[in-house]
């Protein structure tokens, strides 16, 4: 099936409702034999390295398995307060600079930073700055970590669609990352402001933020845009867990102009792991 036919078929599906239904299923406490069989089948299908995570019998639901932690010590964090560490395990989709207020999604497709962040004033802070888009496949570890230490100053929740974010969709659906539901975490770091955008996708029913349990889960029916700026920012450390996808998706990092420089070897398709250096001070 070619890309356009695939996307045309997806247009007919109630993607948000489907994602809520799948999300509910992943939170179902199925009988242990059923649960273990499902997890093992999923791991075989996608090539998940089960040696990196706790034993399967500790997970009460399939969703807990999907957002599984890693065994301690498997993802060392690149040292240096001005070194940007990868927040996720995944593949580079795009990197570049925000030019004319826009980010590149794929060859011949771009989209506005203001639409992505749901906040024009916030987007203006990143005009001309570096960005990186990282795609998490189903096999990947799905927790998100802080790329730098500093303080969380606020967040933005932007409701939207739940298109897939696989390569076929990225090549075909214009403005995909500004269409899908997303949670934007805003940081002040040794490299200035940084935004960590967690973009939802089909069957990615929820994105949770560990730094503030009061933030509502995403993919709620009838949800409205929300924002919050903390009177007392929340201190965080580089490599600390930021949150998790309860199925896979995409993370986009944005930096202030003149503050961060990304490694030029981060070409589309390059694999990265949590804690690996992505760049540093400009």
From Swiss-Prot:
GO MF annotation list: phosphatidylserine decarboxylase activity
Site feature Cleavage (non-hydrolytic), where: 248-249
Cofactor note: Binds 1 pyruvoyl group covalently per subunit.
Enzyme Commission (EC) number: 4.1.1.65
Domain of life: Bacteria
Keyword Magnesium: no
Pathway(s) this gene product operates in, as recorded in its UniProt entry: Phospholipid metabolism; phosphatidylethanolamine biosynthesis; phosphatidylethanolamine from CDP-diacylglycerol: step 2/2
Intracellular or extracellular location(s): Cell membrane
Cofactor(s), names only, from the UniProt record: pyruvate
Residue positions of the active site: 89, 145, 249
PTM text: Is synthesized initially as an inactive proenzyme. Formation of the active enzyme involves a self-maturation process in which the active site pyruvoyl group is generated from an internal serine residue via an autocatalytic post-translational modification. Two non-identical subunits are generated from the proenzyme in this reaction, and the pyruvate is formed at the N-terminus of the alpha chain, which is derived from the carboxyl end of the proenzyme.
Annotated catalysed reactions: a 1,2-diacyl-sn-glycero-3-phospho-L-serine + H(+) = a 1,2-diacyl-sn-glycero-3-phosphoethanolamine + CO2
GO biological process, one term: phosphatidylethanolamine biosynthetic process
Pfam families listed in its UniProt record: PS_Dcarbxylase
Keyword set, alphabetical order: Cell membrane, Decarboxylase, Lipid biosynthesis, Lipid metabolism, Lyase, Membrane, Phospholipid biosynthesis, Phospholipid metabolism, Pyruvate, Zymogen
UniProt membrane topology term: Peripheral membrane protein
InterPro entries: PS_Dcarbxylase, PSD-B, PSD_type1_pro
Gene Ontology cellular-component terms listed: plasma membrane
NCBIfam families named among the record's database cross-references: PS_decarb
Subunit structure, as described in the record: Heterodimer of a large membrane-associated beta subunit and a small pyruvoyl-containing alpha subunit.
Family classification: Belongs to the phosphatidylserine decarboxylase family. PSD-B subfamily. Prokaryotic type I sub-subfamily.
Function (record text): Catalyzes the formation of phosphatidylethanolamine (PtdEtn) from phosphatidylserine (PtdSer).
Name by which UniProt lists this protein: Phosphatidylserine decarboxylase proenzyme
